[in-house]
Amino acid sequence: LITNGEKGLARKMSALRSFYGYYFKHRIIQKNPTLLVDMPKLHDKAIIRLDTDEVALLLDFVESAGEHLTGQALNYYKKTRDRDIAILTLLLGTGIRVSECVGLDIKDVDFKNNGIMVTRKGGNQMVVYFGDEVAEALKNYMAGDRAAATPLPGHEQALFLSTQRKRMGVQAVENMVKKYARQVTPNKKITPHKLRSTY
């Protein structure tokens, strides 16, 4: 539900701050205008979510985790890094559900308009738009690992593939998010649903 109530505004500001903060830190942009805007106050109970710094830390960790790995763990990381960055950036940048994320086909991604066609609960389809940061992560994955992959029969159209060359499932994404989040926010039980709260 798209709203401009305090929750809707806070959600949009949180997403903007997350991405501006990340790209400012990496010197891709010179200014972070979101720091000049106060976050809307929420008057209901606190929700566990990632703050701007934690989003940056999470993405940084996924990008550089291979520095601390060897052997099979390093090989697995290299195979999944770009995919995992694309998934995390997409979840954080759009607020879509994990089930909607894993249900995406390659044809559902429209870079001309920066949108994805998602199938909502009940089967309704709608376009969800994304920013340049999400586009960059998706293009990097799709032009690299996804283009080089040979999916198993029946999984040729899937956007996100497992290391078994099948469409990723909800459980696999949930496990991936928890794995990385544990390293960055050990005191918060972060799940993909919490990433939607961050959005």
Q: Which residues are covered by each model-predicted region?
A:
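Conserved catalytic core of the tyrosine transesterase superfamily
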Residues: 1-199
